[in-house]
A protein has these predicted regions:
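Juxtamembrane intracellular "pre-TM" segments in multi-pass secondary transporters
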Residues: 1-5, 184-221
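Substrate-agnostic recognition of the 12-TM MFS/MFS-like secondary transporter fold
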Residues: 7-23, 47-60, 66-78, 97-156, ...
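A single, central transmembrane helix in multi-pass transporters
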Residues: 25, 160-164, 202-267
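Extracellular/periplasmic helix-loop-helix junction of adjacent transmembrane segments
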Residues: 25-51
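Transmembrane alpha-helix termini and helix-breaking/packing motifs in multi-pass membrane transporters
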Residues: 27-33, 86, 146-166, 243-244, ...
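Helix-breaking motifs and short loop linkers at transmembrane-helix boundaries and internal kinks
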Residues: 34, 66, 88-92, 300-301
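C-terminal transmembrane bundle of multi-pass solute transporters/carriers
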Residues: 53-57, 64, 68-77, 84, ...
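Helix-loop junctions on the cytosolic side of multi-pass membrane transporters
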Residues: 164-194, 396-406
Length: 406
């Protein structure tokens, strides 16, 4: 299991860094060859649509098939598609081919990610699950900061094909790592034999499970609500920072590092904590931290500050918000791994991912309309989101006292 744990950490690094670098370079490349923001926006739309429409379908199948064979096949498809696009003359200067490669790589990345997440506990055991979830989170946050910096340096000297070569190498390394991971073959066979139902009936099993397990239902429901409200925060932070307080893109980049820095710090600390507390306690503290971080965002709207003070306030706020998000997400991911049955875990994770992909963009859409209508909605939305976090913290207490879950 320790060998699997090490291989999964390595796989996480190589699979993410290749995708991050290519996505970063592709955004600049599309804007360069078309001069159209809409062409770039289409890539984001494709990405979101694939996650919304494809997650539940993939979740249905990965609970029924051999996970290792499926991951290997997805990695092979990624590698072959990269080779094909690379060999087609002038393909990366044509939007059609760019959209095709984006679709293929998004589908394969999503499929591999869901498959790994659905079988994580069986791969590393309870002994290493805390470290696996936490350190994967650290890698994601490190690359969130590092990949754009590295990508910018590489893009200044090399063209988009260089990034395709880098991605080909990282995907090939990821494939070699997967081949060395020992999957639980007995479990894969058991799931394949037991789950022989239609698509809709199989998800009825998931909803039945949620109905009888209030703790898992609470995680799914509160996550959806928070994702919707965080659409306002996601748009509101850069929107208010630039348009209301007249800050520049460099300063925006500085404050946005606060979130991944919080993720890195907490991800390194969490596995070493001896008393991690209950899930409800963690979620309560996380909601309070989120509320405090969001309320701090309201301070510059109330009184006048120098630009440096606004920069510091926003950075502190984002760091606190990032701490609250990670304090919530890491224990939740570990809890889900331990308490959702393997036979439906893929479908549950797919359902959760689909709801997140729907709720946050919807929140972003509503926020954009309101913020364009009147800037007063910045402080209103921040205040409402903070109040909602306090309400959720209280509801967790009520459930713990009266229903005895978690």
């Amino acid at each position: 299991m320790k060998k699997n744990y090490i291989f999964i950490i390595l796989f996480t690094f190589f699979s993410i860094i290749g995708s991050k670098l290519f996505t970063f370079a592709l955004s600049f490349h599309v804007l360069k060859i078309t001069g159209s923001v809409q062409a770039f926006s289409n890539i984001m739309i494709i990405y979101s649509l694939i996650f919304i429409l494809g997650s539940t379908s993939i979740g249905y199948y990965i609970d029924k098939i051999n996970k290792k064979s499926f991951i290997i096949s997805m990695q092979c498809i990624s590698i072959l598609s990269i080779i094909s696009i690379f060999l087609i003359p002038n393909s990366l200067n044509q939007l059609l081919y760019i959209y095709i490669i984006v679709i293929i790589l998004t589908v394969t990345d999503m499929a591999v990610s869901l498959t790994f997440n659905s079988g994580l506990l069986s791969l590393v055991s309870e002994r290493f699950i805390d470290q696996t979830v936490s350190y994967r989170n650290v890698i994601q946050n490190v690359l969130q900061i590092g990949a754009p910096i590295l990508g910018g340096i590489v893009y200044a000297y090399f063209d988009i094909k260089t990034f395709m070569i880098i991605m080909f190498v990282t995907e090939l390394i990821s494939l070699i790592i997967v081949l060395n991971i020992a999957f639980n073959k007995v479990l894969a066979k058991k799931v394949y034999e037991e789950v022989k139902d239609t698509f809709f009936n199989s998800y009825k099993v998931v909803f039945k499970f949620l109905k009888s397990n209030k703790d898992i239902f609470l995680i799914l429901l509160s996550g959806s609500i928070i994702n919707f409200m965080f659409g306002f925060v996601t748009v509101g932070i850069p929107g208010s920072f630039v348009t209301i307080f007249n800050m520049n893109s460099k300063q925006l980049g500085i404050i946005e590092t606060g979130f991944p820095l919080a993720g890195i710090l907490f991800g390194l600390i969490y596995p070493k904590l001896k008393n991690k507390g209950t899930l409800v306690a963690n979620m309560q503290v996380a909601m309070i931290i989120l509320a405090v971080g969001i309320l701090i965002l309201c301070i510059p709207f109330i009184t006048d500050f120098y630009k440096l003070s606004i920069l510091v306030i926003y950075f502190i706020s984002i760091f606190i918000i990032g701490s609250g998000v990670v304090l919530s997400n890491v224990p939740i991911n570990i809890y889900v791994q331990k308490n959702v049955p393997e036979q439906i875990k893929g479908k549950y994770l797919a359902l959760s991912q689909t709801m997140s992909q729907v709720m946050m963009p919807f929140g972003i859409l509503v926020a954009g309309i309101l913020f364009d209508f009147n800037s007063v909605f910045y402080i209103i939305s921040f205040s409402i989101t903070a109040i909602l976090c306090f309400i959720l913290a209280y509801l967790y207490t009520f459930i713990k006292k009266h229903d005895g879950v978690i």
